[in-house]
Every structure is written in structure tokens, then in C-alpha cells.
């Protein structure tokens, strides 16, 4: 019989990265600006309210920056390289947001826009900052992957979350490569129709065609989802004895990560076939059922791994 201890969340070893937190705060303010813009500005750009895209980007950057700053704080020491790369992320993000909000003020779209020399130049700059942001995140991710940031379940949730996030960021490259069918627009996120098709509430994702923004969004936020799940399992452990076993929690995290990656592959495949998220065909439903089955089996195996762990010791 092995001994179980009631787990606790890992504590930060270094201060939160200030530039990342300042950037998160600035984007939180931009969310307010965007919401006000949606209320008072009735302009439409690329089929949706003008302030919808910048508001979404601001919200995304808030979560992304806070999560990255928190994960970095869990390292016993923060290397100069990691800190510098985090600052690079901030600089790239600032440039991106300045262009996105600036283009809205001008009354034109930011992404894929090559209508004028200025628009084309801004789009090239945006494309460059996206690559820089990806590479900086990759360097930070490699450093975090090599470190032990808590128990095995927390550590692996971070490692796998970073890996899936990098895939999600990379999937963004699918959009500029697509033919838009519209003069002056170099790229598209809609598959099977020009951008601007009817969209879902809140997200704006196409309800009539495939939408490559879905896998991009879903993938890049694994950085928040999986570590949050691991933290939730730790928080619930005092009330649910089964979760006091690190083996069980690790198994659940691996299962969740595999399921997350599988869903990412599924929504990418679905989008590339020109199929809207809310109207799956039989092939998509069959694949989804297989993923659900695999996750259920993984959960059962993880729970079964707790056999023989009975005694509980409070840490």
C-alpha cells in the first residue's frame, strides 16, 4: 500500500514578468475600448462589426500573457534568455495590436489586406510579428518544458499545453496561404466561400463554411486549458480522495491532452473540408465519437491506476 499526500499547487519562485503583466493590463483596457466601440460604432468590416476582431484579440492576449507570466514564475530561476523572449512577445504583441486597432480606426481590415501600399506594408509587418511571436514562445516553451514545475501532473500539463499551443500558433499560417477570391485581399480564414459569411454569436466563426480560425484559437489556448485542469484536480484532491494520487492526476492530464490534441486535429480537418463547426457530417461525428470513447477509456484506466493507494497523509 502506497502513501498518498494531499497535494498543493506549486508556488511561484520568481516575480511575475512585468512587461507581460503590463501588456495584459493594457489589453484588458483595450477590451473595454472595443466593447464601447461595438456599442457606438455601427461600421461593418469583413462581414462583422468593426470592433469585434480587435476586442477578440485583446481578450486573447490577456489570457495568453497572464498564463505565460504565471508559468514562467514557477521556475526556480528565470534565465535572461527566457525573460528577453517574453519581452519580445510583448513587443510583437504591441505592434500587432497597434496595427489591428489602427486599421479599425481607418475603417479597413487588418488581416490579409494588400489593397494599398500602406495596407500591404502593415500586413507584411503583422506577418513578421506573428512569426517572431511564435519563435519567442517556442524558446520560452523549450525552457519551461525542461523544468520541473510542480508534481508530475502539473509539469506535464504545462509541457503538453505548450506543445499543443505551438501547433495552434503554427496553424495560423494556413490562412495567409489561401486564395481569398477578392481583389486586394491576400489570404482568408473561410474555406469554401469568401470571408464575411454569417457567423456564430461571440466568436464570429462561420455557420455556413469551414473556418480556420477555430483550430488556431483552440490550439493556442491549450496553454491555459491544460494547466488550469491540472490545478483544478489539485484543488479538488482534498475533497476527492481518488485525486490525491499523483498517478491518477497524471493519467487524467495525459488523457485530457491526448483528447485535446485529437479535437484540434478534428476541427482542423473539418475546417479544411469547408464544413462549419455546428453542422458536422457523418465522418466528423464518427471521428468525434472515437475521440470521446478514447477519452472515457483513458479516464477509466487512470482511475484504475489508483488501486492499492489507500492511506492518506495531509501534507
List each model region and its residues.
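Membrane-interface capping segments at transmembrane-helix boundaries
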Residues: 298-315
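Membrane-interfacial catalytic/cofactor-binding modules of polytopic membrane enzymes
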Residues: 176-223
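Aromatic-rich transmembrane-lumenal/periplasmic boundary elements in polytopic membrane proteins
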Residues: 153-190
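Short, Lys/Arg-rich, polar N-terminal cytosolic tail immediately upstream
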Residues: 1-16
Amino acid at each position: 500500500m502506497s502513501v498518498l499526500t494531499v497535494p498543493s499547487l506549486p508556488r511561484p519562485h520568481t516575480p511575475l514578468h512585468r512587461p507581460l503583466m503590463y501588456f495584459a493590463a493594457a489589453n484588458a483596457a483595450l477590451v473595454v475600448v472595443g466593447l464601447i466601440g461595438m456599442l457606438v460604432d455601427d461600421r461593418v468590416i469583413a462581414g462583422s462589426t468593426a470592433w469585434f476582431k480587435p476586442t477578440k484579440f485583446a481578450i486573447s492576449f490577456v489570457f495568453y500573457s497572464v498564463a505565460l507570466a504565471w508559468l514562467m514564475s514557477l521556475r526556480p530561476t528565470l534565465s535572461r534568455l527566457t525573460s528577453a523572449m517574453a519581452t519580445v512577445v510583448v513587443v510583437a504583441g504591441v505592434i500587432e495590436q497597434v496595427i489591428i486597432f489602427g486599421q479599425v480606426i481607418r475603417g479597413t481590415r487588418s488581416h490579409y489586406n494588400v489593397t494599398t501600399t500602406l495596407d500591404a506594408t502593415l500586413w507584411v509587418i503583422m506577418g513578421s510579428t506573428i512569426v517572431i511571436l511564435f519563435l519567442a514562445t517556442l524558446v520560452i516553451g523549450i525552457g519551461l518544458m525542461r523544468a520541473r514545475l510542480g508534481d508530475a501532473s502539473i509539469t506535464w500539463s504545462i509541457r503538453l499545453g505548450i506543445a499543443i499551443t505551438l501547433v495552434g500558433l503554427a496553424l495560423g499560417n494556413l490562412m495567409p496561404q489561401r486564395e481569398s477570391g477578392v481583389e486586394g485581399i491576400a489570404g482568408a480564414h473561410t474555406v469554401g466561400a469568401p470571408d464575411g459569411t454569417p457567423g456564430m454569436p461571440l466568436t464570429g466563426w462561420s455557420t455556413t463554411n469551414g473556418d480556420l480560425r477555430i483550430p488556431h484559437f483552440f490550439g493556442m489556448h491549450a496553454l491555459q486549458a491544460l494547466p488550469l485542469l491540472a490545478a483544478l484536480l489539485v484543488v479538488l484532491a482534498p475533497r476527492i480522495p481518488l485525486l490525491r494520487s499523483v498517478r491518477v492526476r497524471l493519467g487524467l492530464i495525459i488523457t485530457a491532452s491526448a483528447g485535446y490534441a485529437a479535437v484540434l486535429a478534428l476541427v482542423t480537418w473539418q475546417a479544411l473540408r469547408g464544413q462549419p463547426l455546428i453542422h458536422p457530417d457523418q465522418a466528423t461525428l464518427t471521428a468525434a465519437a472515437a475521440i470521446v470513447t478514447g477519452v472515457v477509456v483513458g479516464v477509466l484506466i487512470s482511475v484504475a491506476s489508483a488501486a492499492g493507494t489507500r492511506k492518506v497523509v495531509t501534507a
